[in-house]
Amino acid sequence: MPDPALNVAELLDLDRRHVWHPYGPMPGRQDPLVVESASGVRLRPADGSGELVDGMSSWWSAIHGYNHPVLNAAAREQLERMSHVMFGGLTHEPAVRLAKLLVDMSPEGLEHVFLADSGSVSVEVAVKMCLQYWRSLGRPGKHRLLTWRGGYHGDTWQPMSVCDPEGGMHELWSGVLPRQVFADAPPAEYEETYADHLRSMVERHAGELAAVIVEPVVQGAGGMRFHSPAYLRVLREACDAHDVLLVFDEIATGFGRTGALFAAEHAAVTPDVMCVGKALTGGYLTMAATLCTSRVAEGISRGEVPVLAHGPTFMGNPLAAAVACASIGLLLGQDWLAEVKRIETGLGEGLAPAAGLPGVRDVRVLGAIGVVQLDHAVDMRAATKAAVREGVWLRPFRDLVYTMPPYVTGDADVARIARAVCAAAREG
């Protein structure tokens, strides 16, 4: 007999005692919101307290909203064929179709696709590709990574090593993680002195650098900062001049979030390796990908160990791949850029009043991203409650109250989200 349905209090009690939440203690100290269902851009709490407009796209992934009929149909149809099959020695249409879609839509030259389980894993794979590339070429001394401060690349081992080591989410591990090379954080506008700093850092460390890895145009969970695309061209030129690979982490920025399909397009630059995730499946299932050029793939294949020794159990999962294909088709089949620009305009207008609030350091908007930065650590509980009172779900952190809404969010809901961000900044 199945267990009888649990009421909200029972769910929360079990959750508190047994379930570990992201960046949370055990046992839990705060009760999360129990969500019963979601549709469009709205979450329905199980306590009947009223729907909430989702201002977070479930950590930036649900770009089409929830319960979308096209994505639902893709999942159901694939489920009836096969939900999973191992990817070692086997292949299948959803994975092959997805790889071709990614190659066709990505910056020219990225020809090869490794399908991963999550964004962090895709960064692990990217790092492994770069290190193995130089080992295959007989240059094992090129084993370090250069990045700029203020970044975030994930919570597994190598990604943690290229997150900001001072004040970042993984400062606890600074003594045991691989020691990487850090440039200063990029300024918002182009500054030639900073460009020279980047050139100097690449040149100085070229003999030990396997790759430079950065989040292009937008630094995500490290601080939601924006920077000039021109720095990407500076890095491309410096890496080419000094024989260093270039990796772009597009996990947060990919699939239109910044007003370009991939943020690399703002600079007309192709990296040697690119990571994508989050919005890849429209927020339905966990999947990410690492793309690379033929130079990288062929270099690895010429080595003493001519294979990329990485094989997750759920690699190329057909269910996730089928939904990813449907999500990409949905994105490309509409005027996604007009929708992102519409949201950008709405957030720009709606967040402007926040600039006059006490305690607000900066307000910035790019594409479907809106950020209010405070001059103090946000009171997450107070800020979240303020947003919920406005009928909106937000997840502030550090000194930030921000939103990255689904692209299908209507004008009235964009305005509501902006009001909620302002309220959260005021209360938090």
Swiss-Prot record:
This is Adenosylmethionine-8-amino-7-oxononanoate aminotransferase. Its EC number is 2.6.1.62. It comes from Streptomyces coelicolor (strain ATCC BAA-471 / A3(2) / M145). GO terms for molecular function: adenosylmethionine-8-amino-7-oxononanoate transaminase activity; pyridoxal phosphate binding. Homodimer. The record marks Y23 as: Participates in the substrate recognition with KAPA and in a stacking interaction with the adenine ring of SAM. InterPro entries: Aminotrans_3, Aminotrans_3_PPA_site, BioA, PyrdxlP-dep_Trfase, PyrdxlP-dep_Trfase_major, PyrdxlP-dep_Trfase_small. The modification N6-(pyridoxal phosphate)lysine is found at K278. GO terms for biological process: biotin biosynthetic process.
